[in-house]
Every structure is written in structure tokens, then in C-alpha cells.
């Protein structure tokens, strides 16, 4: 045990070891509170005094939630050597987190965003104080759990740090080689002397490698044999990186370098976040310091990412989930454009559904006022055009080969890889199930909305039939009036045109039978048991009641337990006979559980999901055809309504001229009677006939007017027929 005046620690209670110091878990003598105690070794005292004091001076300047806090600088009781009393971080480092098999292929998106936020926050504080860290890596980013239960990451180990302004440079070498800037790598690792000096932006390269590692679980630049076994190829990769690339991997000995500007398929970050993150990585993983972003642009771009809100969207036809990263002050027009970037559905073709209702977003509506969404309750988007089903894009990862040879080191590495693969399969199975559940929900809602559209079309057709019937009756009565006018030798040039309209209206009336037949066909397809009922969605695929994810989790727990035991066995370096036999039995169990898990994943999860996806694509294609057919029928009804309305307007104009024609008819009779000198009987007959004609015409005019009034009232009752089941925001 060692101690200072206020703290004590056990030499066996070590938290970490470095080149110049060890860190122990210590306690305050009076309170018992835990602290991290950094004790410097003999090698550290070989450094110049100013270098030894540099870490103390740097830490004294820093005070930020994302920097490990320095509480005191004390002296060890016996040696009188300086020790640092620092904030204790019980959850280890980011490296510890990435070593967990569950993070073998990168952190979950929510955790990665916390890492991004906290590292950027800590880096910004360093820059505000003119400090360059020079050894940023996952092992120097500590983790604690905050009061809200979320992780908080803090930069630590400022042994390599020094004060440096943006326009200053340095020549001394520090850092960990996998995370080193290429210029520093050349001199520090390859031992090649050059006259280059290094600026503060060398930290940005290390940050870029760290972020890529956190996002994917792997280093971005990897020679075939590994970064530390083939340093020349490593240097070739980091200096030869094309502009825009964020990774370079050599997959075979002496093979070519595979460059990529995208995250690997196994990365769990969403497409929306990757689109924002990859340009940042591409511009800070830049060997040429002239081309590399400066701190100002780095902080501006990362701050832009961190200040966005997320809107969850599910593309029904693609069968894909999306996260739309958007500023709260952006409008719906921007949202539609961002949806297009991820789904390739143009804004004019995007139909939105939220909680079973159509969602219409006013183009000026701010994103902060959109409905609240989650992964399980997103906004659904469908297209008015045919789209191919995509489904979940994921890496098809196989189990590593399990060698029968007894090897503690090899077995621990193998067990870690196996556990990582099964973790990935378990996570993928959960996502596949979520996609199927969202499809079931979306299909059910889409069927209901199409039924609403069908009812609207039936409603419109009924309205058109009634209107058409009234109009035909009006025209027929108008024809009678004009025929009576013809009897008294009055000119009625409109009669021929009215007869043509009557013929056209009868033709339109006869077309209603075809529309009715098509509507009945659509109704039968949408009805329970019909071709487009949603019963298939409940029959195909996997369901929560199958508990496939839970079954995989049970196997994963067994595998993880064996992995942790193998880690302990590796630390022992050599096992007694009985422990060795148990180790061999566990290795057999590991193989059994892993193969069973992957077989279950393949047969029960993937195969059934693929069948569900194929059925979904077929159903969506048929549904789109039905919707287009229904839209065509609706348009036909509107076209007929428009044509009937035009004829009705013409009929109304004729009705307005009838009183004048009736007066003309009366005058025409008197004028015709004067020169003929008819007998008194003939005159009486003609007068009575005209009175009767006038009464009939007045009756027709009155009836026509009443019909028009009924039509107007009917129209006002149906004007809002198309606005049901719609949320307008």
C-alpha cells in the first residue's frame, strides 16, 4: 500500500499502465471517496523537468465536464514523488466499451452521438485554452454514468499534451501509432528523419480515427497482417489515402488496398447520420495539413450534426427505416427534400401516414411542430409510383473457424470473435422483426386509407349519378318546351343543340355501369379474404410471439459467459489439469451454442423474413395497381361531373330565356290571328291552347328551378367529402 497525506491505494488495485506512469484506484483517508491516483515511474523522471511539469500545468488550466478533473497534486509519503489525485471513472474507457462483444461492429447510434458530443466538447475546451493533446485514442477517453443514466465521456492522460496556438508548431513525438498523423507516424514509427513540423490539427487525425473506430468497431486503416506487424504498408495506406476516402483495408498479403468513402455495411449508424459524418471524417483524415480542415470548420460541422433533431420515417414500399436529421427550424419543404435524399421518392410523390391517418404537412411548417416519432412509431411514407423492395441492408457475417487445438490466447480471441458475430446476429434479428411489425402496421393502415378512398369514390359516383339524373330530366323537360314553341311556329334554333346534349347525357349515364362494375371489383379485392386483404401479413414472416430474438439471447448469454471465462483463463496463462479439461469442454459448448444460434438466425429469422419481404413486394405492386385504377375511376367521376355541370349551366341559360320566348309566343299568336279573321270558335280554341301551353311552360320552368336548387344544396353537402381521415399540420 502507498499513500499521500490525504489518500491511499493498493499497488494491486491498478486501473491502467502507461509508459511513464501507473494509475491506481485510491480512497480519501477521511471520506472513503474513490479517486484515480496517477503515480509516475522512474522512466518519467528521465524527462526534462519542464516536460515533467507540463502535465500539471495543463491540468490546472482545464475545467470542463468532458475533461477528467484534477483535484490535487500531492506527494507520495515515502518517495516524495508527485502524484495526481484525479476524478475516478468506474466504467473504464471508450476502448473498454469497444472491446465488449456487443460493440464488435461499432456503437449503437445513440451511444455514438454521446461520444461525438463529449469528445467535441472536450476538444473545444482544449482549443479554447490553447492546448493540443497529442495522444487522443479510445483508451484516453474515460466513461462515467451521469445522473440521468446516460454515459458521459471525458478526455484524460495529458502527459503528451502541451500548450500550442493554432499558428504554432512542434517537433517532439507522442501518441499511439494506430492513431498517429502520417507525418508523425513516419518519424516516430518508421524512424525516418525529416524536417516537418506539426501543428495543432494533428489531433484532428487522431479524432477521425477514434470516431471511425467507435462507429465501426474497427480501425479505418488496416494492413493484412495488422497495423503493428506491417508498418511500411500502414504508412503507405495513411499517406496514399485518396481524397474523400475514410478507410483503406488490405484484404490479402501483398494485395491491393480497398478504399472506401462509406462506412461498412455492418455499421449500425443510420444512413442519415452517416451522410453527415462521412464528410467530416474524410476532411480530418487528410494527410496534407494544407487540405485538412481546421478546428473552426471541424467544430462548426460537428456542432451542426449535434444540433439536429431526428424524425423517424419508414418507407413502406422499400421496407426500410430512415432517420431524418433536420434542424428544428427547418420547414416541411426541407423535410420532404431530405426524405427524397434517402428514399429517392420525389416530394410530389410522397404520401405520409402517421398513426393511421394521412399526414399533410404545410410546406412552411417547422420541424419542431411535427408529430413526435420513435423507431417503433415513425411517419410512414409511400410513393404513387412503383418501387422495388429493399429491406434491411446488413452484413452476412459467418462464424470464424474454431480450431480444435488447445491455446489459451487463441481461444480467447476466437471466443471474442464468435461472441461478436452472435451479438450482431441477435441485433439483426431484432431489427428484422421490427421491420416486419412496421410493415404489418403500415399495410393495415394503407388498406384502411384505400378503403376510405374507395368510399369517397363511391360517394362521388353517387353524387354524379344523382346530378346526371336531374340534368337528364331537366333537358327532357326543356326539349318539351321547345317542341311546344315549335308548334306555334316560333323559331327554336336551340332545339337541335339541346337534343345533342340529351344524347351525350344518356351516353354518360350508360357509362356508369362500367364504373360500377370496376368499383365492385375493387371492393371484392379489399374485402376480408380478398386478394388485397392484409391477412398475408399476419401469416408470413416472424412474430414477437415466436420469441426468436429471446431464443438467440439465451444462446448469446451462454456464449458470452464462456468468453469471459476464456478471458480469465488467458490471464492465468496456464491452467491446472482440471481447469484445462473444463476449458476444453467449454470450447465444445461454445461451438455448439454458436452454430445453433447462427442456424436459428438463418432458418427462423432470415428465411422467414425473406419470404415476408417477397410477399410484401408482390402485395405492394398489386395495391399500387388498384390505387391507380381507383384514381382513374375517381378522375372519370370528376370528368363526368365537370361535363354535366357544363351542360347544366347551358340548360340554366336556356331557362332564363324561356319567359321572353313565352311572351313572344303569346304575341305571336295575336299577331298571327289579326289578318286571318278566324271564326269565333277557332279563336277560342287557339286562346285556350296558348293558355295551356303557357301554364305547361311555367310549370316546367318552376320544376327546373326547383331541380337546380336541389342540386346546389346537394353539392354543398358533399363538398367536404374528400377531407375525411386526414391530419393537416
From Swiss-Prot:
EC top class, as a word: transferase
Active site: residue positions: 135 (proton acceptor)
Enzyme Commission (EC) number: 2.7.11.1
Listed GO biological process terms: activation of innate immune response; antiviral innate immune response; cytoplasmic pattern recognition receptor signaling pathway; defense response to Gram-positive bacterium; dendritic cell proliferation; innate immune response; negative regulation of gene expression; negative regulation of TORC1 signaling
Domain of life the protein comes from: Eukaryota
MF (Gene Ontology): ATP binding; identical protein binding; nucleic acid binding; phosphoprotein binding; protein phosphatase binding; protein serine kinase activity; protein serine/threonine kinase activity; RNA polymerase II-specific DNA-binding transcription factor binding
Subcellular localization, as worded in the UniProt entry: Cytoplasm
Span of the signal peptide: none
Domain Protein kinase: 9-310
Residue numbers spanned by region Interaction with AZI2, TANK and TBKBP1: 621-729
Entry comment on modification after translation: Autophosphorylation at Ser-172 activates the kinase, and is an essential step for virus-triggered signaling. Phosphorylated by IKBKB/IKKB at Ser-172. Phosphorylation requires homodimerization and ubiquitination at Lys-30 and Lys-401. Dephosphorylated at Ser-172 by PPM1B and this negatively regulates its role in mediating antiviral response. 'Lys-63'-linked polyubiquitination by MIB1 after RNA virus infection, or by NRDP1 after LPS stimulation at Lys-30 and Lys-401, participates in kinase activation. 'Lys-48'-linked polyubiquitination at Lys-670 by DTX4 leads to proteasomal degradation. 'Lys-48'-linked polyubiquitination by TRAIP also leads to proteasomal degradation. 'Lys-48'-linked polyubiquitination by TRAF7; leading to proteasomal degradation. 'Lys-63'-linked polyubiquitination by RNF128 at Lys-30 and Lys-401 leads to the activation of antiviral responses.
Summary of the function given for this chain in its UniProt record: Serine/threonine kinase that plays an essential role in regulating inflammatory responses to foreign agents. Following activation of toll-like receptors by viral or bacterial components, associates with TRAF3 and TANK and phosphorylates interferon regulatory factors (IRFs) IRF3 and IRF7 as well as DDX3X. This activity allows subsequent homodimerization and nuclear translocation of the IRFs leading to transcriptional activation of pro-inflammatory and antiviral genes including IFNA and IFNB.
Subunit structure: Homodimer. Interacts with DDX3X, TIRAP and TRAF2. Part of a ternary complex consisting of TANK, TRAF2 and TBK1. Interacts with AZI2, TANK and TBKBP1; these interactions are mutually exclusive and mediate TBK1 activation. Interacts with GSK3B; this interaction promotes TBK1 self-association and autophosphorylation. Interacts with SIKE1; SIKE1 is associated with TBK1 under physiological condition and dissociated from TBK1 upon viral infection or TLR3 stimulation. Interacts with IRF3, leading to IRF3 phosphorylation. Interacts with RIGI. Interacts with CYLD. Interacts with OPTN and TRAF3.
Family per record: Belongs to the protein kinase superfamily. Ser/Thr protein kinase family. I-kappa-B kinase subfamily.
Protein name, entry field: Serine/threonine-protein kinase TBK1
Organism of derivation: Mus musculus
Lineage of producing organism: Eukaryota, Metazoa, Chordata, Craniata, Vertebrata
Amino acid at each position: 500500500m502507498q499513500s499521500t497525506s490525504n489518500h491511499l491505494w493498493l499497488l494491486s488495485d491498478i486501473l491502467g499502465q502507461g509508459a511513464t506512469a501507473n494509475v491506481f484506484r485510491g480512497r480519501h483517508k477521511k471520506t472513503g471517496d474513490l479517486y484515480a491516483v496517477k503515480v509516475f515511474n522512474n522512466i518519467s523522471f528521465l524527462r526534462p523537468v519542464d516536460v515533467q511539469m507540463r502535465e500539471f500545468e495543463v491540468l490546472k488550466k482545464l475545467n470542463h465536464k468532458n475533461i477528467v478533473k484534477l483535484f490535487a497534486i500531492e506527494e507520495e509519503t515515502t518517495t516524495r514523488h508527485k502524484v495526481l489525485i484525479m476524478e475516478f471513472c468506474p466504467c473504464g474507457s471508450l476502448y473498454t466499451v469497444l472491446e465488449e462483444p456487443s460493440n464488435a461492429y461499432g456503437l449503437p447510434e445513440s451511444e455514438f452521438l454521446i461520444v461525438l458530443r463529449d469528445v467535441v466538447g472536450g476538444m473545444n475546451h482544449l482549443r479554447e485554452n490553447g492546448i493540443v493533446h497529442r495522444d487522443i485514442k479510445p483508451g484516453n477517453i474515460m466513461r462515467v454514468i451521469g445522473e440521468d443514466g446516460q454515459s458521459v465521456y471525458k478526455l484524460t492522460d495529458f502527459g503528451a499534451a502541451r500548450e500550442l496556438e493554432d499558428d504554432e508548431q512542434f517537433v517532439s513525438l507522442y501518441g499511439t501509432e494506430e492513431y498517429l498523423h502520417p507525418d508523425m507516424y513516419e518519424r516516430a514509427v518508421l524512424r525516418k528523419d525529416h524536417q516537418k513540423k506539426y501543428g495543432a490539427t494533428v489531433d484532428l487525425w487522431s479524432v477521425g480515427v477514434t470516431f471511425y473506430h467507435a462507429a465501426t468497431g474497427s480501425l479505418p486503416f488496416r494492413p493484412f497482417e495488422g497495423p503493428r506487424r506491417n508498418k511500411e504498408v500502414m504508412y503507405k495506406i495513411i499517406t496514399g489515402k485518396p481524397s474523400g476516402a475514410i478507410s483503406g483495408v488490405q484484404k490479402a498479403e501483398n494485395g491491393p488496398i480497398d478504399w472506401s468513402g462509406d462506412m461498412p455495411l455492418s455499421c449500425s449508424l443510420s444512413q442519415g447520420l452517416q451522410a453527415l459524418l462521412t464528410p467530416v471524417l474524410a476532411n480530418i483524415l487528410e494527410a496534407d495539413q494544407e487540405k485538412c480542415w481546421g478546428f473552426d470548420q471541424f467544430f462548426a460541422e460537428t456542432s451542426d450534426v449535434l444540433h439536429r433533431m431526428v424524425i423517424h420515417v419508414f418507407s413502406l414500399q422499400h421496407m426500410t427505416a430512415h432517420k431524418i436529421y433536420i434542424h428544428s427550424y427547418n420547414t416541411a419543404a426541407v423535410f420532404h427534400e431530405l426524405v427524397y435524399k434517402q428514399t429517392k421518392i420525389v416530394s410530389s410523390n410522397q404520401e405520409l401516414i402517421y398513426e393511421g391517418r394521412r399526414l399533410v404537412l404545410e410546406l412552411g411548417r417547422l420541424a419542431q411542430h411535427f408529430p413526435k416519432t420513435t423507431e417503433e412509431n415513425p411517419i410512414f411514407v409511400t410513393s404513387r409510383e412503383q418501387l422495388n423492395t429493399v429491406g434491411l441492408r446488413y452484413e452476412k457475417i459467418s462464424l470464424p473457424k474454431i480450431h480444435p487445438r488447445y491455446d489459451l490466447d487463441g481461444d480467447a480471441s476466437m471466443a471474442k470473435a464468435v461472441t461478436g458475430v452472435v451479438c450482431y446476429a441477435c441485433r439483426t434479428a431484432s431489427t428484422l422483426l421490427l421491420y416486419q411489425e412496421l410493415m404489418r402496421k403500415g399495410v393495415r393502415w394503407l388498406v384502411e386509407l384505400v378503403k376510405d378512398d374507395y368510399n369517397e369514390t363511391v360517394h362521388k359516383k353517387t353524387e354524379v349519378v344523382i346530378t346526371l339524373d336531374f340534368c337528364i330530366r331537366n333537358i327532357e323537360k326543356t326539349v318539351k318546351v321547345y317542341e311546344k314553341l315549335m308548334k306555334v311556329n316560333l323559331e327554336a334554333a336551340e332545339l337541335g343543340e339541346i337534343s345533342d346534349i340529351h344524347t351525350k347525357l344518356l351516353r354518360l349515364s350508360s357509362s356508369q355501369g362500367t364504373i360500377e362494375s370496376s368499383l365492385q371489383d375493387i371492393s371484392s379485392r379489399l374485402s376480408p379474404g380478398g386478394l388485397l386483404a392484409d391477412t398475408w401479413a399476419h401469416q408470413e414472416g416472424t412474430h414477437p410471439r415466436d420469441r426468436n430474438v429471446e431464443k438467440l439471447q439465451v444462446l448469446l448469454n451462454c456464449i458470452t459467459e464462456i468468453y469471459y471465462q476464456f478471458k480469465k483463463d488467458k490471464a492465468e496463462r496456464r491452467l491446472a489439469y482440471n481447469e484445462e479439461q473444463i476449458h476444453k469442454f467449454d470450447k465444445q459448448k461454445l461451438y455448439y451454442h454458436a452454430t445453433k444460434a447462427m442456424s436459428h438466425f438463418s432458418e427462423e429469422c432470415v428465411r422467414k423474413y425473406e419470404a415476408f419481404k417477397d410477399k410484401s413486394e408482390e402485395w405492394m405492386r398489386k395495391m399500387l395497381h388498384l390505387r391507380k385504377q381507383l384514381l382513374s375511376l375517381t378522375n372519370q367521376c370528376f370528368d363526368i361531373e365537370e361535363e354535366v355541370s357544363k351542360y347544366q349551366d347551358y340548360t340554366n341559360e336556356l331557362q332564363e330565356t324561356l319567359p321572353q320566348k313565352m311572351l313572344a309566343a303569346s304575341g305571336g299568336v295575336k299577331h298571327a290571328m289579326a289578318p286571318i279573321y278566324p271564326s269565333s270558335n277557332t279563336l277560342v280554341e287557339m286562346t285556350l291552347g296558348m293558355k295551356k301551353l303557357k301554364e305547361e311552360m311555367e310549370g316546367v320552368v318552376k320544376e327546373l328551378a326547383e331541380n337546380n336548387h336541389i342540386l346546389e344544396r346537394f353539392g354543398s353537402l358533399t363538398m367536404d367529402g374528400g377531407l375525411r381521415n386526414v391530419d393537416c399540420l
